[in-house]
């Protein structure tokens, strides 16, 4: 194996390409939630298009590939220019988090126009050389995302709103390393921003989706967030599973046959139901003990938010049952339990929005070995971001937390068709049994 290295060619702020408002914007209740103040890191892999495809030149220097315009300009330059233009529309991203002078103790966004920290980098290898960034990673996190020193970027990481790195590989592919602050955008909002960059990179006059700030229209219930949770010391093992489209289709048909032809379920429902079943059996929990799943669902439709709202609009969905019941249930039966929890979410969200929870904080979490936290990246919109080079072959979080029992659901990387589950939810003593149970019928 060779020595793989990434060189940071240039780095510094990219500012809006035109004048933007100078103001301080308040954040919504969910934006201000203590656990959201920090950068979410992800990587987005773009392969070089097939050179064997039939190409025809365009007047602007690009080419047509299979009826689509292909950008043959350097990716870093294209993304940098489009980012500057996108920041005119999404100008809060060019600011920083500060304390709200009108509401002391609350964070707000100072729209200062300082910009987004941007890095152009080059790797001395192909994407194949580093196994297309499959785990375990053959390049470090610091190689793939911006990690500026205080001298390079004086804004503290938890107060920075976005950082972007474009790393080109010798094969012609490139990787976008993204860091966005969860305090200003959930996954859907961050993907909306990056799709806007892609729209402008492809030559559209403006983003297809008009951004809406409107945090003042978001519910602000008189509910105090609970204390920050204690993190257990759980040395968890990392395991990846790919669920083929055929397997998912088979179980969807089984669920419809059991629940009724009008009832449908998603790939997400299936993979987390199977995870819940297999993990519960593998850890051999006390049959009477409660085993739990928690994931966040979009509340945009429930709360009637406008299209283009890019702040946090999520609400927790919590599923709990006795370990003995979960272990004895089929995957299809557990899909039904998950679907029922999702059905209840709208009512629970509205009760929270109206302050009718008796002071209880539904976002309060307890981290223990009996609980698994699920993050769904499969439908956020990152897989649709196109800078003129086509959609990414894979897009997902850079690292998973090895202290919290958690899993990531995402699209399987191309050319696979199906769903990938990245699990960090069992200790070493349970890992082999868990993996065997998960894979026993994935054919």
From Swiss-Prot:
Taxonomic superkingdom: Eukaryota
Record flagged with keyword Acyltransferase: yes
Name of one Pfam family that matches: Transferase
Observed phenotype of the null mutant: Reduced seed mass.
GO-annotated molecular function: hydroxycinnamoyltransferase activity
Top-level EC class as recorded in UniProt: transferase
Record keywords, A-Z: Acyltransferase, Transferase
Gene3D superfamilies linked: Chloramphenicol acetyltransferase-like domain
Cited InterPro entries: CAT-like_dom_sf, Plant_acyltransferase
Active site annotation, chain numbering: 182, 386
Coiled-coil segments: none
EC number: 2.3.1.-
Function, in words: Involved in the incorporation of ferulate into the cell wall. May act as arabinoxylan feruloyl transferase. May function as p-coumaroyl-CoA transferase involved in glucuronoarabinoxylan modification.
Record's miscellaneous remark: The gain-of-function mutant OsAT10-D (T-DNA tagging) shows significant reduction of ferulate in leaf cell wall and strong increase p-coumarate in young leaf tissue but no discernible phenotypic alterations in vegetative development, lignin content, or lignin composition.
Family statement: Belongs to the plant acyltransferase family.
Name of this chain's protein: Acyl transferase 10
Native species: Oryza sativa subsp. japonica
The encoding gene: AT10
